[in-house]
Amino acid sequence: DVNRSGGVLLLAQMSSRGNLLHPGYTKEVVDNGVAHDGVFGFIGNGSRPAELAALRATVGEGKMIWTPGVNLAVGDGEMGQRYGDPTAAVLSGSDCIIVGSGIHKADDPRAAAAAYAEASWKGLLQRNG
């Protein structure tokens, strides 16, 4: 106990092409992270629902999963990013989607933010049935 508030999100997966994670990386990170109370969650791959679902199955419900790599325009980005559907990410186990360019590069960022909120809420309602 170090008498502090807060916690850590560990990077378990990446959505960008050509990332430097080796094949056993996710398992190592999750094994270490679930054992420590200071770790409240993991960063997962929002562009690959199957990978994200596998992460959720391994992590269980006791830790959060936050996911970048989501965009309403599913596909590849300008710098090697891969984007998946935000609703699919939540259905696959994400607790929180992380959105950057999908909002700040939109013609109407406010409307885009509302669309992402709606998409993630839809996924959460479907997931929790």
Where on the chain are the PLM-derived regions?
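Conserved anion-binding
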Residues: D1-M64, N71-G75
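Functionally constrained cores in energy, signaling, and assembly domains
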Residues: G6, A12, G44, K63-W66, ...
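C-terminal helical cap(s) of enzyme catalytic domains, especially alpha/beta-barrels
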Residues: V90-S92, S101-G129
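Generic secondary-structure signature for well-ordered alpha-helical cores
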Residues: N3, A35-G38, D95, E118-Q126
